[in-house]
């Protein structure tokens, strides 16, 4: 990765989810102004790659507001592609916070599959500030109500609606992200399960706002759709404004999608 450009950072996207990726393996330097970098480059997250004793690299994730995130599936696909290209392999591992390890597989020219791990559904694992039924959270805001909560390496709630385009996510997102039920704030998804069995999805990402794509949100959408009984299969396409992700749930959740350079 270190030879990609003179400034030692790369601009990439995973289905429209935009990143600045900084290779800091040689220095293990995390002393960057992440909010400034995000503002100057118009990216959703800033990703810093450092060395890991447990995996091929350690991936640090910073939101557009400078806050840290625990998981970013789309960024993992981008980093996975870079490392696999550098190493000449079709499999690498990425370490995240809490010693979580993501497995990445090359399945096409620029198509990467990521093992996102097991979804967590207990209220204290989301986490929530008080004990609740995570399949039916007691939240109602304008036309949104009765969301499902799940942790896919980071906390998510999913609302099911008849039309994702009718929801004013720009105004509702900040209120839901900062709801008192979520001590670590929350990622918000608006999901529409279509007759075809595919899912249309719009996302408000914690610390960033509306994004064109969010890999962990797509995983959350499939898991919660299945738990609610809206889907009878455990594999489907999730259609986001930035593109399509294939999500599979077989004990662990797997996400497959394309990457690109900006």
From Swiss-Prot:
Ligase: present as a keyword of the record?
no
Question: Which terms are listed as keywords in the entry?
Answer: Amino-acid biosynthesis, Cytoplasm, Isomerase, Lysine biosynthesis
Q: Which residues bind substrate?
A: 17, 45, 63, 73-74, 154, 187, 205-206, 215-216
Give yes or no: UniProt keyword Repressor: no
- Can you cite a GO biological process for this protein? lysine biosynthetic process via diaminopimelate
What top-level class of enzyme does the UniProt entry assign?
A: isomerase
Kindly give the PROSITE patterns that the UniProt entry links to this protein. DAP_EPIMERASE
Pathway stated in the Swiss-Prot or TrEMBL entry: Amino-acid biosynthesis; L-lysine biosynthesis via DAP pathway; DL-2,6-diaminopimelate from LL-2,6-diaminopimelate: step 1/1
Q: Name one GO molecular function term.
A: diaminopimelate epimerase activity
Q: Name one GO cellular component term.
A: cytosol
The source's superkingdom equals Bacteria
Q: Site annotated as Could be important to modulate the pK values of the two catalytic cysteine residues: where?
A: 156, 205
State the compartments where it is located: Cytoplasm
Catalytic residues, per the record, are 72, 214
Q: What EC number(s) would the UniProt record show?
A: 5.1.1.7
Primary location recorded for the protein, binned into one broad class:
cytoplasm
Query: Which residue ranges run through the membrane?
Result: none
**Family, similarity comment:** Belongs to the diaminopimelate epimerase family.
Quaternary structure annotation from Swiss-Prot or TrEMBL: Homodimer.
| Protein name, entry field | Diaminopimelate epimerase
Species for this entry: Wolbachia sp. subsp. Drosophila simulans (strain wRi)
